[in-house]
Amino acid sequence: MFAPFLLTNKLMHTTENKPTIHDPREEPTQFFITDRLQLGEIIEQLTVFTGKADLKIMSFSVGEEFVRKIHTLKKKGRIKSAELVFDFKAAEKTARTNTLTTTVFYRVYYCTNHAKVVVVAGEQQTCTVLTSQNGTRGTRNEAYFITNKGDIAEYVRRKLEKLRASRVNTGD
């Protein structure tokens, strides 16, 4: 489906510095491991490059800080809509934030899921973030792979459609 890429010094970052997210039109493949960025910050920066965006988020779980970040981006006009797919078990563990989550996200689907992927489909371009980080706050090193390759975003969209068929939908 897509060819492996070579990591160059420009793509590799250390945890000593906060990674810089480049415009995916100029750097179509970006990879870094860091404890200096959160997933919500990456989404925020990508919307600068994509324009107002629709989000499709897959995560094992989400936390209040991440949900509030998405809410803030919606209020700023950076996000048109956001859909969330996350795991049944995680939903039970994060029950106290479920009301906030279902208010912020256009649709929330529960299913068996451990993937952590975000599609940022903007007016100017579409980007996909593959990450080890859930939509939670953490201080651990996490891996992030950002690409604007359309076949990857399309694959994620198709997979989400299949997952929706096996889920419980909490908002329409």
Model region roles, listed by residue range:
Residues 1-172:
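PLD/PLD-like phosphodiesterase catalytic module centered on the HKD motif
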